[in-house]
Each structure stands twice: as structure tokens, then as C-alpha cells.
């Protein structure tokens, strides 16, 4: 049986893998501006909790319009993506979004900011 720390590492590793699959398949949108432009087809939005208010407002509007949940990460999303400058990402594939949301919900560093349905 795994302790809480080991389970959290497993969830982070799973999320990192799902984000990697999304990158390789082109089913991810990176950056608040691009997410706000795309909106349609977005299934899950992930962002750093320390994003600027304007960018966060745009992500919330994109989440509301697309019906996608928006989760804020108390860490660096870019590190999970291996692209340090990235502060927001949106998954477009339904199955990857569901799997990623499962890993996000199990993690302690994530908070639901805006509800939605994948």
C-alpha cells in the first residue's frame, strides 16, 4: 500500500504522461491567449494559480463558453509539460481530458476554479 506522498507522485506522473500524449498528438492548446482564441473543442483547462487576473478572467470566460472545467495548480504547470514558460494549457481530446482530470482530482495541489463537463 502506498503512502500519501507516493500516491501524489504517481498522480503527478500520470498527469505528466497525459499531457505528453496530448502534446505529441497535437490535442493541446498552450497559453491563455491561445486558449481564449480557441474556446471550441476545449475539454479541460489547467492553469497556474498565480496567473495574472486578466489572463485568469480570459480562461474563466473560455471555460464558461466551452463548458470545460478549469483547475488551478499550486505549482508550475510548465514543469509538468517540460515547457517552463507555459502557465496554462487546455486539452482537446475527450478521453485524455477525462484521464487527466482524474489525476488532477487525486492531487492535493489542484483546485477547481470553474466547474464544467468534459
Model-found features: residue ranges?
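Structural motif
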Residues: 27, 43-44, 69-71, 87-89
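N-terminal first-folded block
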Residues: 11-47
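C-terminal structural segments of small proteins and small subunits
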Residues: 78-117
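Glycine-rich phosphate-binding loops at beta-strand->alpha-helix junctions
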Residues: 49-53
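Positively charged, polar, low-complexity stretches
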Residues: 21-26, 30-36, 54-80
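Small/polar loops that bind or transfer phosphate-bearing groups
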Residues: 47-48, 92
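Long, charged, low-complexity intrinsically disordered regions
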Residues: 2, 6-8
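SAM-dependent transferase fold signal centered on methyltransferase-like domains
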Residues: 4, 32, 47, 108, ...
Amino acid at each position: 500500500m502506498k503512502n500519501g506522498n507516493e500516491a501524489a507522485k504517481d498522480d503527478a506522473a500520470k498527469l505528466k504522461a497525459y499531457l505528453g500524449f496530448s502534446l505529441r498528438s497535437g490535442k493541446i492548446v498552450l497559453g491563455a491567449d491561445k486558449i481564449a482564441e480557441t474556446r471550441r473543442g476545449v475539454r479541460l483547462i489547467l492553469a497556474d494559480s498565480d496567473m495574472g487576473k486578466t489572463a485568469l478572467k480570459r480562461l474563466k470566460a473560455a471555460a464558461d463558453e466551452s463548458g470545460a472545467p478549469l483547475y488551478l495548480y499550486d505549482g508550475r504547470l510548465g514543469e509538468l509539460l517540460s515547457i517552463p514558460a507555459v502557465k496554462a494549457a487546455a486539452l482537446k481530446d475527450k478521453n485524455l481530458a477525462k484521464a487527466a482530470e482524474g489525476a488532477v482530482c487525486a492531487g492535493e495541489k489542484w483546485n477547481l476554479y470553474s466547474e464544467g463537463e468534459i
